[in-house]
């Protein structure tokens, strides 16, 4: 039924503005799962303004707040992941899974989607499994360089698995599209010197941008506490995003902004900050790397070592193997961090080579490519 309806759409006299399709979206738990789902939905909506969307999330998780803020309807399942740290918390998990499957079945039968897209997270497992069981075509988007457990399971049922990285097992219908990123990262990047001037920095001095996410990175923050005096001696500028948890402590310890050193709790205009940087230090989350690849600045990655299946290290290694980035482990945030950073800062040819190699991973139109593939696949079935 779903394929036939989409094939009919190709030949109807109606314009896209008049057509109505129903799309089930599921992804959440972290921003890295939520943002791609919203970006894909927005791309579909730009082509089919009358399209109806329903997101399925996990109750109590951030998608229940973020998705409505993005303008989409969402229903929640009482589902959670397996807790490796406290096994007793998993006693009720089988009952939650069964309950979620039943609720997902009810949601999908009522909504009657034409197809479903999952971007990972607790709720996408039951939502897309049930959709597939009911004959709804499903598509999976994987942000990391390795498939998460949920997407491994769903990938075998999917019409396509859209990969953020090119290296994925051949037994799945994988398509390398890259990860959807914020549109302004593509459109608002400006000349480096101009960006430095806008940020009140010396346009002629090399500038490092350090980003650790909205909560910040304790590892990166501790490193800058240690190496800030050496950085000043080198006459290198630093834009240091601390995150909200440690901002006040860092300000009291290191002082407020001084010439060439900007300490910020949060950076609202990331496109401007990226533009101003000559070198970027970052964790190795999938969406962060996708943005950095499009920005094309030399990067030093410090993977978060406790990410599921150590996927941040695998993300970073995908770039390191192409000489598109340097990596320092969390346990190596000592002189090795400093020496690696200075190797990048003091070698202009190396910086140019890293920037050039990053282009292999840059996919500024990932959401468009994903939606193109979805409709190409549906119309040929």
Tell where the protein language model's regions lie, with residue ranges.
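Acidic donor-binding loop of glycosyltransferase active sites
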Residues: 113-115, 275-290, 297-298
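Active-site-proximal region of nucleotide-activated glycan assembly enzymes
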Residues: 22, 52, 62, 73, ...
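N-terminal subdomain of nucleotide-sugar transferases
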Residues: 2-57
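C-terminal alpha-helical cap of glycosyltransferases
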Residues: 2-3, 10, 364-381
